[in-house]
């Protein structure tokens, strides 16, 4: 742990800026573990990096008044994204002065100042829903992240309010009860969306349409066949080919129906044989039982 009040050197600030440019803001532990920056930042902790980067961003964005921060705190609390603006080139002495004068101001107030104050609490709650779903998607754990992992992700990416843990517990319970999340062994996963009902309806209607088409197939009598043959004598080659294709299709339908009827008849015959065998066995058993009873009575 580095000393909080120890002044930052230009080399440390340069290493911090380079680390943020390489890994992004919020990845403080990753920056400290990076061999390119670990030597220069060996006296600093992840909290030191976060505070210093916040002060650099605040100064670059024009926020430096304690009074503005206190007024922003009175307007309300909500989960807000962390500031990610690139810091401007400023004098090192000014940075140290800003660190000494603004370090005790809560970071939520800094980020809250530029946000609209008339937003309703319902919108804040809805935004917390989005943050929870975002955390689950980004963490990509097979069995789902725990509540602690979700909270750590949101705290690492955003500035949560003081009662964040209570709000998170309430919101997770509500999402589970509404069916949006699935909770198994204290871990949370996004519930799979149900398949569109249109696909099932399409398959059913398609099957019904094929069945109706088969039922409507023409069944020609002998006289109709003779009439069709007479009609074919005056046809061209194209008309005759189309007529023949139609006849083949109707024949295939008839063959399929005949095969289905044969299968049904065979199944019925097998059922009848099984029923007859069962009846014969019962009859034989009854006869043997009656014979045994008569023998006992005779004795």
UniProtKB/Swiss-Prot annotation:
Entries under InterPro entries matching the protein: Histone_H1/H5_H15, Homeodomain-like_sf, Myb_dom, SANT/Myb, SMH1-6, WH-like_DNA-bd_sf, WH_DNA-bd_sf
Any coiled-coil regions, as ranges: 238-279
Disulfide bonds: none
Residue intervals of the H15 domain: 124-192
GO terms under cellular component: chromatin; chromosome, telomeric region; nucleolus; nucleosome; nucleus
Gene Ontology BP terms: nucleosome assembly
Keywords per UniProt: Chromosome, Coiled coil, DNA-binding, Nucleus, Telomere, Transcription, Transcription regulation
Span of domain HTH myb-type: 1-61
Pfam name, any one: Myb_DNA-binding
CDD domains: SANT_TRF
Matching SUPFAM superfamilies: Homeodomain-like, Winged helix' DNA-binding domain
Subcellular location: Nucleus; Chromosome; Nucleus, Nucleolus; Chromosome, Telomere
Annotation: DNA-binding region: 28-57
Tissues where the protein occurs: Expressed in leaves.
Main location: nucleus
A molecular-function term among this protein's GO annotations: protein homodimerization activity
SMART domains per UniProt: H15, SANT
Alphabetized PANTHER family for the sequence: SINGLE MYB HISTONE 1, SINGLE MYB HISTONE 4
Family: Belongs to the histone H1/H5 family. SMH subfamily.
Domain notes: HTH myb-type domain confers double-stranded telomeric DNA-binding while the H15 domain is involved in non-specific DNA-protein interaction and multimerization.
Subunit structure: Forms a homodimer and heterodimers.
Functional summary from the UniProt entry: Binds preferentially double-stranded telomeric repeats 5'-TTTAGGG-3', but can also bind to the single G-rich and C-rich telomeric strand.
Protein name: Single myb histone 1
Source organism: Zea mays (Maize)
């Amino acid at each position: 742990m580095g000393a909080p009040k120890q002044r930052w050197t230009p080399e440390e600030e340069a290493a911090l800026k380079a680390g943020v440019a390489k890994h992004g803001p919020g990845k403080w532990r990753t920056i400290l573990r990076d061999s390119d920056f670990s030597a220069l930042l060996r006296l600093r902790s992840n909290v030191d990096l976060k505070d210093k980067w916040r002060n650099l961003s605040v100064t670059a964005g024009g926020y430096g008044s304690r009074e503005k921060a206190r007024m922003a705190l009175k307007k309300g609390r909500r989960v807000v994204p962390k500031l990610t603006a690139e810091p401007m080139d400023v004098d090192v002495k000014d940075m140290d002065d800003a660190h000494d004068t603004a370090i005790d101001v809560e970071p939520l107030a800094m980020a809250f100042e530029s946000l609209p104050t008339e937003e309703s609490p319902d919108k804040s709650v809805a935004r917390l829903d989005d943050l929870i779903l975002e955390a689950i998607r980004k963490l990509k754990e097979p069995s789902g992240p725990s509540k602690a992992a979700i909270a750590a992700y949101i705290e690492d990416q955003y500035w949560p309010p003081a009662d964040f843990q209570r709000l998170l517990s309430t919101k997770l319970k509500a999402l589970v009860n509404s069916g949006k999340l699935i909770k198994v062994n204290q871990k949370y996963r996004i519930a799979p969306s149900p398949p569109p009902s249109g696909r099932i309806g399409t398959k059913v209607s398609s099957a019904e349409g094929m069945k109706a088409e088969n039922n409507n197939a023409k069944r020609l009598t002998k006289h109709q066949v003779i009439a069709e043959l007479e009609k074919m004598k005056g046809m061209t080659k194209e008309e005759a080919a189309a007529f023949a294709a139609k006849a083949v299709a109707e024949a295939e339908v008839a063959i399929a129906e005949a095969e289905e009827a044969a299968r049904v008849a065979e199944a019925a015959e097998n059922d009848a044989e099984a029923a007859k065998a069962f009846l014969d066995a019962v009859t034989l058993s009854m006869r043997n039982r009656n014979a045994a009873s008569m023998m006992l009575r005779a004795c």
